[in-house]
């Protein structure tokens, strides 16, 4: 048997982390078993489905590297197939037309609630022969009257539901459009899906869908339902907790494999291992180690993983991802150091690519923004003479290299009997605008001689102006 899994999002909003984890688990299960992963867009909600959301799903999957073997298939392109199966079920007596009005159904619901009964359709049209006479109708499934629906969920174990608890669900609405539970069964059947991995909000749909599979003499897939992801406050993850859309994490500067590594550990474990390459995920993944408990999304843990990959990945690969952030900020990368050289000195100083971009822009701009507190603290008249001497020493350098730069700084600090920090920190503020940067020799080396000298000259003017104002 060839394992075939699917990811079937509805394009009614962004691709959120819960959906991404479902996609990841489905993708990993298929890859682990040398199977196939199918993408299906469940776009039957015509009012809420948008092409923009479809594109966000495709872009998010591409960014994460969750490539699909087939698809994307669109439910709206399969309406003829749903009608064909509905007519087949009608012909076989496994479905029936229902002409109950909205008013009757609402009155039925209110009466059942008043009697403290579970609201459900009472089968009013079940045994009537209603011709297609032009009166609006829905098509309902003739659910078995008796017996028990039993299935083994790969996460939750054995589940049993009495058919008496299930009413006759609607398959096709009066406007001819299929319902979710009907379309998804036909799709999984036609697409030969062997394993349905999805959120546990669908677990109540499963007995109904199993009955439909059996009515169609279709093979019933294996089901695995994943517990939901909560925020750290124990509430369902939402926008108030921060980023929840996969492409928002790209904007925040999270590397795609860092997000995958984090998500795979939300509800799944492989011993005590925390760090997984994508290949290690594929090799190790199984469903038996998926937890039944809910997971909490912890941003600190995600950024810890992200920083790990920033430091352990090759500077070239991190630079490729970082480039997008500089482009979004409108920074001309031709005006500064090679990005891979920047990554080599900044990766361990930042938790994200967005932060790396933000604190590194002074390497690529002609002008810098000064932190006024840093200026007041370090660009004081007392350092004017040492910085003037350092300026001349640096300007005279033939080789603009780390060791030569550091040698100049050391010599000037000795000449004026200053602690190294007393000269390095004013120099740092002079060339970066702030009191934090990589090592001062590396900072100047990456900036280049011309920028470093020009900024030091600008800082000397600031100090002279400050001295004359005293």
From Swiss-Prot:
GO molecular function: ATP binding; glutamate-tRNA ligase activity; tRNA binding; zinc ion binding
The species this protein was found in: Legionella pneumophila (strain Corby)
Subcellular location: Cytoplasm
Residues given in the record as ATP binding sites: 239
Short sequence motif 'KMSKS' region: positions: 236-240
Chief localisation class: cytoplasm
HAMAP family: Glu_tRNA_synth_type1
Role, per record: Catalyzes the attachment of glutamate to tRNA(Glu) in a two-step reaction: glutamate is first activated by ATP to form Glu-AMP and then transferred to the acceptor end of tRNA(Glu).
Alphabetical keyword list: Aminoacyl-tRNA synthetase, ATP-binding, Cytoplasm, Ligase, Nucleotide-binding, Protein biosynthesis
GO biological process, one term: glutamyl-tRNA aminoacylation
Assembly notes: Monomer.
Matching PROSITE patterns: AA_TRNA_LIGASE_I (PS00178)
Gene that encodes it: gltX
Span of the annotated motif 'HIGH' region: 9-19
Transmembrane regions listed in the UniProt entry: none
Family: Belongs to the class-I aminoacyl-tRNA synthetase family. Glutamate--tRNA ligase type 1 subfamily.
InterPro entries: aa-tRNA-synth_I_cd-bd (IPR045462), aa-tRNA-synth_I_codon-bd_sub2 (IPR020751), aa-tRNA-synth_I_CS (IPR001412), aa_tRNA-synth_I_cd-bd_sf (IPR008925), Glu-tRNA-ligase_bac/mito (IPR004527), Glu/Gln-tRNA-synth (IPR000924), Glu/Gln-tRNA-synth_Ib_cat-dom (IPR020058), GluQ/Sye (IPR049940)
Any single Gene Ontology cellular-component annotation: cytosol
This protein's name: Glutamate--tRNA ligase
Catalytic activity, reaction form: tRNA(Glu) + L-glutamate + ATP = L-glutamyl-tRNA(Glu) + AMP + diphosphate
Class in the EC hierarchy, top level: ligase
EC number(s) recorded for this UniProt protein: 6.1.1.17
């Amino acid at each position: 048997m060839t394992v075939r899994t699917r990811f079937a999002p509805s394009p009614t909003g962004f691709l959120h982390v819960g959906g991404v984890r479902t996609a990841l688990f489905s993708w990993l299960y298929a890859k682990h078993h040398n199977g196939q992963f199918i993408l299906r867009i469940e776009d039957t909600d015509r009012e809420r489905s948008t092409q923009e959301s479809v594109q966000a799903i495709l872009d998010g999957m591409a960014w994460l590297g969750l490539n699909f073997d087939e698809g994307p298939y669109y439910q709206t392109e399969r309406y003829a197939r749903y009608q064909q199966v509905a007519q087949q079920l009608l012909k076989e007596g496994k479905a029936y037309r229902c002409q109950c009005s909205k008013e009757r159904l609402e009155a039925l619901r209110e009466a059942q609630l008043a009697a403290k009964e579970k609201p459900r359709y009472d089968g009013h049209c079940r045994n009537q022969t209603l011709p297609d006479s032009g009166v609006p109708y829905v098509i309902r499934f003739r659910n078995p009257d008796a017996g028990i629906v039993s299935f083994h969920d790969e996460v939750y174990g054995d589940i049993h539901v009495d058919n008496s608890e299930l009413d006759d669900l609607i398959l096709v609405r009066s406007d001819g459009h299929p319902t979710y539970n009907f379309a998804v069964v036909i799709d999984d059947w036609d697409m030969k899906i062997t394993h349905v991995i999805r959120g546990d909000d669908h677990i109540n749909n499963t007995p109904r869908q199993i009955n439909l599979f059996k009515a169609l003499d279709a093979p019933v897939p294996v089901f695995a339902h994943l517990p939901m992801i909560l925020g750290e406050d124990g509430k369902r993850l939402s926008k108030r907790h921060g980023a929840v859309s996969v492409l928002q994490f790209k904007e925040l500067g999270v590397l795609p494999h860092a997000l995958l590594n984090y998500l795979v550990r939300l509800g799944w474990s492989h011993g005590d291992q925390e760090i997984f390459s994508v290949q290690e995920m594929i090799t190790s993944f199984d469903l038996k180690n998926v937890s039944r408990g809910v997971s909490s999304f912890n941003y600190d843990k995600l950024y810890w993983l992200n920083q790990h990959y920033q430091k352990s990945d090759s500077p070239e690969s991190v630079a490729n991802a970082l480039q997008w952030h500089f482009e979004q900020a409108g920074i001309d990368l031709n005006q500064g150091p090679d990005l891979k050289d920047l990554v080599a000195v900044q990766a361990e100083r930042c938790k994200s690519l967005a932060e790396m971009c933000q604190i590194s822009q002074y390497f690529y701009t002609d002008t810098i923004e000064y932190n006024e507190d840093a200026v007041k603290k370090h660009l004081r008249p007392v350092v004017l003479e040492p910085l003037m001497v350092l300026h001349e020493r640096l300007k005279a350098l033939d080789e603009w290299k780390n060791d030569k730069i550091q040698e100049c700084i050391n010599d000037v600090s000795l000449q004026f009997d200053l602690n190294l920090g007393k000269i390095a920190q004013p120099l740092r503020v002079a060339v970066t605008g702030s009191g934090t940067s990589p090592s001062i020799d590396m900072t100047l080396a990456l900036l280049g001689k011309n920028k470093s000298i020009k900024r030091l000259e600008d800082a000397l003017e600031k100090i002279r102006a400050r001295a004359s104002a005293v």
